[in-house]
């Protein structure tokens, strides 16, 4: 398979403590995967400047095609993503006019004064661009560095989703010429451990992702959801998935499995 790697960085004490479920990383992962990227790593760090700098630097050093972060762009003392990204890139924060105008317009429309805390959201790393946030105040941050698309999004899910789409539609440079496709088989009466050697051989033979997801207890009434997925040229990956699916169906029949249309 061809790979266009991506990484996700989630910033927030509330995620690490378990108070907030990391649905942002799940959404970003699904969206990037749908574009043909392979998400190689998701990193979660606390609202600490050194941790944020380290997370960005390490991700950049691995040279993925795209890095997307969520969280830490707001007006409070513990919103440190812009500063952390700037330090990771070796640049200063600067008042970004586009970001400032976006923020000023939103507060002015509501007759709310622009305090220093609100103005803080307009400071971006030098060379970065503001990404429109149509669902909130803090703009996203985009910078193209060492052939890597880097995007920082707010932590509020609806804002993150909006900023991510604006980035994909208007700014993303590294666009895979690949297609991500997947198919599923649902089967009863086959234990995951019994199917495992067949899966292992097919992964080796076709260089494709096959994952068995158990939906019940193996020793009582085994039910499996089998995922077959890959990225590549659309026609090539379609053919490969179909071949794998047919060979898996043959293996399931040998094991006296029962194919279902869904779970």
UniProtKB/Swiss-Prot annotation:
InterPro entries on file: CinA (IPR050101), CinA_Arc (IPR023055), MoaB/Mog-like_dom_sf (IPR036425), MoaB/Mog_dom (IPR001453)
Superkingdom of the source species: Archaea
CDD domains: cinA (cd00885)
Family listed: Belongs to the CinA family.
Matches recorded under HAMAP family: CinA_A (MF_00226_A)
PANTHER family for the chain: NICOTINAMIDE-NUCLEOTIDE AMIDOHYDROLASE PNCC, NMN AMIDOHYDROLASE-LIKE PROTEIN YFAY
Protein name per Swiss-Prot or TrEMBL: Protein LS215_2186
């Amino acid at each position: 398979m061809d790979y266009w790697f991506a990484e996700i960085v989630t910033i927030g004490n509330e995620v690490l403590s378990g108070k907030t479920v990391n649905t942002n990383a799940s959404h970003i992962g699904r969206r990037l995967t749908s574009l043909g990227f392979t998400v190689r790593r998701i990193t979660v760090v606390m609202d600490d400047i050194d941790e944020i700098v380290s997370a960005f630097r390490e991700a950049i050093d691995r040279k993925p095609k795209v890095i997307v972060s969520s969280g830490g762009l707001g007006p409070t003392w513990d919103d440190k993503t812009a500063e952390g990204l700037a330090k990771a890139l070796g640049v200063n924060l600067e008042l970004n006019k586009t970001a400032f105008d976006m923020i000023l317009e939103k507060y002015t429309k509501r007759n709310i004064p622009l305090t220093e805390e609100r103005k803080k959201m307009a400071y971006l790393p030098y060379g970065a661009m503001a990404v429109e946030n149509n669902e909130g105040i803090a703009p996203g941050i985009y910078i193209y560095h060492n052939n890597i698309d880097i995007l920082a999004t707010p932590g509020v899910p609806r804002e993150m989703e909006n900023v991510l789409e604006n980035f994909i539609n208007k700014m993303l440079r590294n666009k895979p010429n690949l297609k991500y496709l997947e198919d599923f088989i649902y089967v009863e009466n086959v234990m995951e451990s019994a199917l495992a050697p067949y899966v292992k051989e097919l992964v080796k033979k076709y260089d494709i992702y096959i994952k068995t997801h158990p939906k019940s207890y193996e020793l009582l009434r085994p039910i499996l959801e089998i995922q077959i997925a890959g990225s590549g040229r659309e026609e090539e990956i379609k053919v490969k998935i179909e071949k794998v699916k047919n060979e898996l169906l043959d293996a399931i029949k040998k094991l006296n499995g029962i194919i279902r249309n869904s779970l």
